[in-house]
Amino acid sequence: MRGRVKNYILEKIREHGAIHMTLIDPEKTTPEVAARIAREVAEAGTSAIMVGGSIGVSEAMTDEVVLAIKRSTEVPVILFPGSPTALSRHADAVWFLSVLNSQNPYFITGAQMQGAPIVKRYGLEVLPLGYIIVGEGGAVSIVSYTRPLPFAKPEVVAAYALAAEYMGFQFVYLEGGSGGEPVPPKIVKMVKGVTTLPLIVGGGIRSPEVAKELAKAGADIIVTGTIVEESENIRETIGRIVRATREGALERSRE
């Protein structure tokens, strides 16, 4: 059914106030490990699993990880492709993203042009996403030729998010970069104040406290990835972040 994953995401946000998604990078895991991670994070309450991130990922690698995840859990699998080669016909949907503050047109429209026919051929549900890199940005800013937007200029980040809405994107994503500093709550709050789009925040989120503050500030979706690669007890770690995310959204609703 067209729009099934989008409707699922929006319904989960309505139900919980804010939700959590787990990012699994095929380059940093094996299908067997990915399946175990997926099962544990799903049991902990994550609402969807994103697959992707790195640029050196082939379709075969993505296929193997996606299929392993889908055999182990029923939560939706959404592709988060670092390049057009990282698409899989077996996923439930794809974040069809444009890096809005890239200085290289390839990451704004070029890769999207290359990937669009593949997405259509595979029949993937498309989730149009305006992707904005802020703060240090980490490796993703280097790879995508992006000048990250400084934390000290939240109004510029908000303007990009508003532009994403006016350009027709259905979601907006604030990326702090893997392993870097998380996006500050003040930026999240300002962005949420100018756009009606569901707001995704990821990068550098390593604790329930940070997840709670970001959800309280306006994040509708919290994404974590590195933390599951490092955690010795994935179910407990993600469970705490899921609960904190929902608590933050509840506090926001009471303000």
Swiss-Prot record:
The keyword Lipid metabolism applies. It is found in: Cytoplasm. It catalyses: sn-glycerol 1-phosphate + (2E,6E,10E)-geranylgeranyl diphosphate = sn-3-O-(geranylgeranyl)glycerol 1-phosphate + diphosphate. The keyword Nuclease does not apply. Pathway: Membrane lipid metabolism; glycerophospholipid metabolism. One of its GO terms (molecular function) is phosphoglycerol geranylgeranyltransferase activity. Its cofactor is Mg(2+). One of its GO terms (cellular component) is cytoplasm. Sn-glycerol 1-phosphate binds at Y173, L174, E175, G176, G177, S178, G179, G203, G204, G225, T226. Pfam families: PcrB. It is an enzyme of class 2 (transferase). GO terms for biological process: glycerophospholipid biosynthetic process. InterPro entries: GGGP/HepGP_synthase_I (IPR039074), GGGP/HepGP_synthase_sf (IPR038597), GGGP_HepGP_synthase (IPR008205), GGGP_synth (IPR010946). Keywords: Cytoplasm, Lipid biosynthesis, Lipid metabolism, Magnesium, Metal-binding, Phospholipid biosynthesis, Phospholipid metabolism, Transferase. Disulfide bonds: none annotated. Mg(2+) binds at D25, S54. Its EC number is 2.5.1.41. Its main location: cytoplasm. Prenyltransferase that catalyzes the transfer of the geranylgeranyl moiety of geranylgeranyl diphosphate (GGPP) to the C3 hydroxyl of sn-glycerol-1-phosphate (G1P). This reaction is the first ether-bond-formation step in the biosynthesis of archaeal membrane lipids. Belongs to the GGGP/HepGP synthase family. Group II subfamily. This is Geranylgeranylglyceryl phosphate synthase. It comes from Thermofilum pendens (strain DSM 2475 / Hrk 5).
